[in-house]
Amino acid sequence: MNEQLQLIKSSIKSIPNHPKEGIIFRDITSLIEVPEAFQATVDLIVGNYKNQGITKVVGTESRGFIFGAPVALALGLPFVLVRKPRKLPRETISQSYQLEYGEDTLEMHVDSVKAGDNVLIIDDLLATGGTVDATIKLIKRLGGDVKHAAFVINLPELGGEERLRSLGVEPFTLVNFEGH
């Protein structure tokens, strides 16, 4: 593991039994409190997607905003928000998806993505891939194309990478953590 990735991984705190017993929460707020680690995170994602023909960057609520906005800015691209219901002011489309215990919904503005857009999705963590799957569906319903998704953290045993590849999306992750 190179020096930048070591810095990133060591800056992420692991909180046992949060938000419930048996879960190890990977806290990226500790990463963004270390400017060198935050910068390295953005730089590595930007470096992977320069000259890839990306036309828009989409970040999912809420931690995807933290990393997606600076990546979009560094690439000179528009940044699009995907949010929980009733948080966006203009006309939206919505997509429901399954959680471990229930269902949730994401929304985006109907005019945020257009036919022909080549979209990069960014979020902080890839677990099962449910959130990013719903985000992909929103983008495709608006005519956009998604071939890439970037994450700071991957929990490989939860199968998110395989799920994305089955959807034709190549995941890019910076650090893996075992256990969840």
Swiss-Prot record:
EC numbers for this chain: 2.4.2.7
Record's keyword terms, sorted: Cytoplasm, Glycosyltransferase, Purine salvage, Transferase
Upper lineage: Bacteria, Pseudomonadati, Pseudomonadota, Gammaproteobacteria, Pasteurellales
Pathway: Purine metabolism; AMP biosynthesis via salvage pathway; AMP from adenine: step 1/1
Catalytic reaction(s) noted: AMP + diphosphate = 5-phospho-alpha-D-ribose 1-diphosphate + adenine
Gene from which this protein is expressed: apt
Location in or out of the cell: Cytoplasm
Protein known as: Adenine phosphoribosyltransferase
Database matches in PROSITE patterns: PUR_PYR_PR_TRANSFER (PS00103)
